[in-house]
A protein has these predicted regions:
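Classical nucleotidyltransferase
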Residues: 1-55, 78, 135-139
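Phosphate/ribose-recognition catalytic cores of enzymes acting on nucleotide-derived substrates
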Residues: 44-159
Length: 159
C-alpha cells in the first residue's frame, strides 16, 4: 500500500508536528483530515476582555498538549452543539499580566452568553499574527478589533 502524500511529501506524524510548530494551520488541518483542536472547560478569567467589549472564553490546555506557536488565530469554536467563528489568542497575555500560565482565550463573533463551566473545542484555522506586548490597553483593543475584522473577512462574514 502506497503512503498518502501531500505537497510531494509523505504524510507522517513527524510532518504534522513540524507544520504545527511552524503554525501552518491550513497544512496541519489537511494532514490531520480535520481541524487541529484544543479542548477544555471554560474558566472565569479577570473579565478584562469583557471590559473592552471583547469578551473571551478562557481554557487552559494540558502541559502534554503539543501546541502551535503563541499567537492569534482565526478559529471556530464548538460550544453546546453549535459552531461559532472567532479569534483566539494562544499565549501568556504580555500586555495584561505576562502570566506564566499558557492560556487559550477566544472571542466569539455573535455570542454573548455565559459559558463558564461548559466544555468547548477550539479549532485553530489560520495563524494571524504573533502574540505581542502593546504599549496600552487601548492599542491592544484596536489590534483585537483589527484581528476580528480580518478573521471575519477570512470567514466571509459581514461586519
Amino acid at each position: 500500500v502506497e503512503k498518502e502524500r501531500y505537497q510531494e511529501r509523505e504524510i507522517s506524524s513527524t510532518y504534522v508536528r513540524e507544520e504545527l510548530r511552524l503554525g501552518h494551520m491550513e497544512t496541519v488541518n489537511v494532514l490531520l483530515g480535520r481541524p487541529y483542536s484544543i479542548y477544555g472547560i471554560v474558566s472565569k478569567g479577570k473579565q478584562l476582555g469583557r471590559q473592552l467589549n471583547l469578551p473571551t472564553l478562557n481554557i487552559y490546555p494540558p502541559d502534554s498538549k503539543l501546541l502551535p506557536p503563541n499567537g492569534v488565530y482565526a478559529s471556530i469554536t464548538r460550544l453546546d452543539g453549535k459552531e461559532y467563528f472567532g479569534v483566539t489568542n494562544l499565549g501568556v497575555r504580555p500586555t495584561l499580566d505576562d502570566s506564566p500560565l499558557l492560556s487559550v482565550e477566544t472571542n466569539l463573533f455573535d455570542y454573548n452568553d455565559d459559558a463558564y463551566g461548559h466544555y468547548i473545542e477550539v479549532q485553530l484555522m489560520h495563524f494571524l499574527r504573533q502574540e505581542m506586548k502593546f504599549d496600552s490597553i487601548e492599542t491592544l483593543k484596536k489590534q483585537m478589533e483589527s484581528d476580528a475584522s480580518f478573521a471575519k473577512e477570512m470567514f466571509l462574514l459581514k461586519n
